[in-house]
Swiss-Prot record:
Homotetramer. FAD binds at residues 172-175, 181, 207, 313-315, 324, 381, 385, 410-412, 428. Its cofactor is FAD. One of its GO terms (biological process) is short-chain fatty acid metabolic process. The gene is ACX4. An acyl-CoA binds at S181, D182, A183, S184, R288, G409. It is an enzyme of class 1 (oxidoreductase). A motif (Microbody targeting signal) lies at residues 434-436. This is Acyl-coenzyme A oxidase 4, peroxisomal. It holds the Pfam family Acyl-CoA_dh_1. The modification N-acetylalanine is found at A2. Particularly abundant in etiolated cotyledons. Also present in flowers, roots and siliques, but not detected in green cotyledons, rosette leaves and stems. CDD domains: GCD. Its EC number is 1.3.3.6.
Length: 436
């Protein structure tokens, strides 16, 4: 077989390619003027049962502020950065100015929102872009909340004010390569040494980890065998965080692999309130509610996009909205959004009155994320060929829902949490083989 020289290969490629092969893509307004892309975000049309009336004036104001910021600052750029799998760091000050980082934490420069207001803000961010909502959720409802619930007074005063302004960013590292759903079996270790601790181990799928200023690391105390929590600073000797490539969902989120090799953490940065795996549950109880509101917001955005698209796009001489099949799918999506919102709202009220159980939170996250997948699938059908373009939101949202369906407890694990609560029987491990 003859081996072509570089010059010959270049010549052959030139012969194969057309004269217009390397031209840049058309602007969407030129290529497809028949419908408006998501860079100009559609108005909200999904609140069919007027759930906004259930919100307090404060909660309504937060919704309005976040919606305006996301539509103005994020919608025009999100497709570009999603495609590049990069986070738009230049908008971080804008996200900080929304005043939602820190959520329900009171004091220390945090907003002290109600759980409902925090949830509404989460949904409004996710309505436009799921990656931005995950960035905020990891930073606020996991990283900051762990310091607020489990940290010392000195740690709260030192770290929370800067985090609340998004001047610094946090991540939360629990998951490991060998321990996802079985997080309580984590293998990262913390060994007591003079003046502090030596951390060794590996974490995976950690959002914000490649650029976070503070990393909340959970490790097993080699003396007590219990789970402890630590605040690790970026660039600590022995710490390395590298980006996980080739994701198909939440592409703007910088998920990373974290390697810890004899990372020294001073005693002052050990979280005194984390002394067992159960202590992480105080944080996860709140974050799981917030995660349930992400697919609510995503589904709102999908519905809004499809509602506008069906009225703009014409086939057979009429808007797509004029056809019975399309109306049926659109109404099914609308019904899903109403039911999802109502379940999410009730979860918030149960939490605010101290009645919410882990099983209720798990059922909410599992059922809502499942209905969101159905909503995204219907939306993809309604948009036809444009349903596979990130420019029209639905394809992007379709992909972004997949990791959300999995993190903070897979659908199956969350059903087992609820199942344990309603039956009194834990079924996380294989049952003993029957002798029958």
């Amino acid at each position: 077989m003859a081996v072509l020289s570089s010059a010959d290969r270049a010549s052959n490629e030139k012969k194969v390619k057309s004269s217009y092969f390397d031209l840049p893509p058309m602007e969407m307004s030129v290529a497809f003027p028949q419908a408006t892309p998501a860079s100009t975000f559609p108005p909200c049309t999904s609140d069919y049962y007027h759930f906004n009336d259930l919100l307090t004036p404060e909660e309504q104001a937060i919704r309005k502020k976040v919606r305006e910021c996301m539509e103005k600052e994020v919608a025009p750029i999100m497709t570009e950065y999603w495609e590049k799998a990069e986070f738009p760091f230049h908008i971080t000050p804008k996200l900080g100015a929304m005043g939602v980082a820190g959520g329900s934490i009171k004091g220390y420069g945090c907003p002290g929102l109600s759980i409902t207001a925090n949830a509404i803000a989460t949904a409004e961010i996710a309505r436009v872009d799921a990656s931005c909502s995950t960035f905020i959720l990891v930073h606020s409802s996991l990283g900051m909340l762990t310091i607020a619930l489990c940290g010392s007074e000195a740690q709260k005063e030192k770290y929370l004010p800067s985090l609340a302004q998004l001047n610094t960013v946090a991540c939360w590292a629990l998951t490991e390569p060998d321990n996802g759903s079985d997080a309580s079996g984590l293998g990262t270790t913390a060994t007591k040494v003079e003046g502090g601790w030596k951390i060794n181990g590996q974490k995976r799928w950690i959002g914000n980890s490649t650029f976070a200023d503070l990393l909340i690391i959970f490790a097993r105390n080699t003396t007590t065998n219990q789970i402890n929590g630590f605040i690790v600073k970026k660039d600590a000797p022995g710490l390395k965080a590298t980006k996980i490539p080739n994701k198909i969902g939440l592409r703007m989120v910088q998920n990373g692999d974290i390697l810890l090799q004899n990372v020294f953490v001073p005693d002052e940065d050990r979280l005194p309130g984390v002394n067992s795996f159960q202590d992480t549950s105080k944080v996860l109880a709140v974050s799981r509610v917030m995660v349930a509101w992400q697919p609510i917001g995503i589904s709102m955005g999908i519905y809004d996009m499809c509602h506008r698209y069906l009225k703009e796009r014409k086939q057979f001489g009429a808007p797509l909205a004029a056809f019975q099949l399309n109306q049926q799918k659109l109404v099914q999506m609308l019904g899903n959004v109403q039911a999802m919102f109502l379940m999410g709202w009730r979860l918030c009220k149960l939490y605010e009155t101290g009645q919410m159980t882990p099983g209720q939170a798990s059922l909410g996250k599992a059922w809502i994320s499942s209905k969101a997948r159905e909503t995204a699938s219907l939306g993809r059908e309604l948009l036809g060929g444009n349903g596979i373009l990130a420019d029209f939101l639905v394809a992007k949202a379709f992909c972004d829902l997949e990791p959300i369906y999995t993190y903070e407890g897979t659908y199956d694990i969350n059903t087992l949490v609820t199942g344990r609560e309603v039956t009194g029987i834990a079924s996380f491990k294989p049952a003993t083989r029957s002798r029958l």
